[in-house]
From Swiss-Prot:
Protein residues bound to ATP: 91-101
Entry keyword set: Amino-acid biosynthesis, ATP-binding, Cytoplasm, Kinase, Nucleotide-binding, Threonine biosynthesis, Transferase
Function summary: Catalyzes the ATP-dependent phosphorylation of L-homoserine to L-homoserine phosphate.
EC assignment: 2.7.1.39
Pathway: Amino-acid biosynthesis; L-threonine biosynthesis; L-threonine from L-aspartate: step 4/5
Top-level taxon of origin: Bacteria
Native source organism of the sequence: Blochmanniella pennsylvanica (strain BPEN)
Kinase as UniProt keyword: yes
Presence of the UniProt keyword Protein biosynthesis in the record: no
Subcellular location(s) per record: Cytoplasm
Chief place where the protein resides: cytoplasm
Pfam families assigned: GHMP_kinases_C, GHMP_kinases_N
The name this protein goes by in its record: Homoserine kinase
GO MF annotation: an example: ATP binding
Length: 312
C-alpha cells in the first residue's frame, strides 16, 4: 500500500492573483490536507472518509479522484486496477486548495505505485490540467505549492511553471475557514473583465516589490506590498464579514497583514509576533466562524509539499 499526504495551500497571498501560492502546515504538527491510500486490486474502487467527505459528489464520474485515475491510465495506455481511499480533510470550495490536495495526492500515489513513469514536470502539468476541470481554467497556484512545497511564483506563460520564493522564518499564518462554501466559479464571476490602467500599474508594482523584498529579506517592504487590488474589492462582499472590518480588528491586535486565501471564504492573517496569535484567533473564532464546520489553524510554510507517508 502507498499512502500520500498533500497539504493545503494559500493561493494569491493577497498580492499575487493567479501568480503566487504557498503550502501551509499547522505548527502543532497536525495534518491540514488530504490523504490518498492506494493498493493493487482486481477491480477499481474508490471510497471516501474524513470530516468533509460528505461534500464530495455522489456520482463516481464527478469525483476528481476518479477523473485523475482515468486520465492517468489514459496517458499510460493501460488500466490499473486499484483500490483507492480518499481521506477528505479539507472542505470543498474553501479557498484552501481542496481540489488540488486530492489531485496532487492521488497522482503522486499512482505514479509512485506504478514505478514513476511520469517525471516531476509531467506530473505538474497533469495536475494543472485536472485542476482546470474543477475551476474552469488551467492554473498552478494551488497544485504547484501543494505538490512541491514552499512559496511559489507561477510563470505559466513562460514555459517555466514555477519558481521558489524565499519567505521569512518568523511569519505565521492564521487561516480562518468560516464553514461556508464559495465556489471558484462564483468567486471569479464577480471580478471585472477589465481593470483601470492605474490599478494594473499599482498591482505590478506591489507584486514585483513583494517578490523582490522576499529575495532581499526586506520584511517591511514585503508587508507594505501585500495589497490586493485585483480580487479583494470585489470578492469581499461574498464573505460573512467584509475584509475591511476583519483587517481593522486584527491589525489593532497586532497582525501585520491579512487577505483572502484563494477564492475564499477562508481568510489568512499574517503575524510576526507570536504573542498576539491567541487574541487574533479568539476574535476570528467569535466573529468570523459561522458554524461548527468552521475552523482556525495556526500555520507556517510547508516546505515539503506532497509526501509518501506509508509504503509497504
Amino acid at each position: 500500500m502507498v499512502r500520500v499526504y498533500a497539504p493545503a495551500s494559500i493561493a494569491n497571498i493577497g498580492v499575487g492573483f493567479d501568480t503566487l501560492g504557498m503550502a501551509i502546515a499547522p505548527i502543532n504538527g497536525s495534518l491540514l490536507g488530504d490523504c490518498i491510500s492506494i493498493e493493487h486490486a482486481n477491480a477499481f474502487s474508490l471510497r471516501s472518509t474524513g470530516f468533509f467527505h460528505s461534500q464530495l459528489p455522489i456520482q463516481l464520474e464527478e469525483n476528481i479522484v476518479f477523473q485523475c485515475w482515468r486520465k492517468f491510465c489514459e496517458i499510460l495506455g493501460q488500466t490499473y486496477f486499484l483500490s483507492i481511499k480518499l481521506e477528505k480533510n479539507i472542505p470543498v470550495a474553501s479557498g484552501l486548495g481542496s481540489s488540488a490536495c486530492s489531485i496532487v495526492a492521488v497522482l503522486v500515489a499512482m505514479n509512485y505505485h506504478c514505478g514513476c513513469p511520469l517525471n516531476t514536470d509531467q506530473l505538474l502539468m497533469l495536475m494543472g490540467e485536472m485542476e482546470g476541470k474543477i475551476s474552469g481554467s488551467i492554473h498552478f497556484d494551488n497544485v504547484s505549492p501543494c505538490f512541491l512545497g514552499g512559496m511559489r511564483l507561477i510563470l505559466q506563460n513562460c514555459n517555466i511553471v514555477n519558481q521558489v520564493i524565499p519567505s521569512f522564518d518568523d511569519w505565521l499564518w492564521i487561516v480562518a475557514y468560516p464553514g461556508i462554501k464559495i465556489s471558484t466559479a462564483v468567486s471569479r464571476s464577480v471580478l471585472p473583465n477589465k481593470y483601470d490602467r492605474e490599478d494594473c500599474i499599482n498591482h505590478s508594482q506591489y507584486l514585483s516589490g513583494f517578490v523582490h523584498a522576499c529575495h532581499t529579506k526586506q520584511e517591511y517592504l514585503a508587508i507594505r506590498c501585500m495589497k490586493d487590488i485585483i480580487a479583494e474589492p470585489y470578492r469581499s462582499r461574498l464573505f460573512p464579514i467584509e475584509l475591511s472590518c476583519i483587517r481593522h480588528n486584527i491589525m489593532k491586535r497586532g497582525a501585520i497583514s491579512c487577505g483572502i486565501s484563494g477564492s475564499g471564504p477562508t481568510v489568512f492573517v499574517l503575524c510576526n509576533n507570536h504573542d498576539v496569535i491567541g487574541d487574533i484567533s479568539d476574535w476570528l473564532s467569535r466573529f468570523y466562524l459561522q458554524n461548527n464546520s468552521g475552523f482556525i489553524r495556526i500555520c507556517s510554510l510547508d516546505n515539503l509539499g506532497a509526501r509518501i507517508m506509508v509504503n509497504n
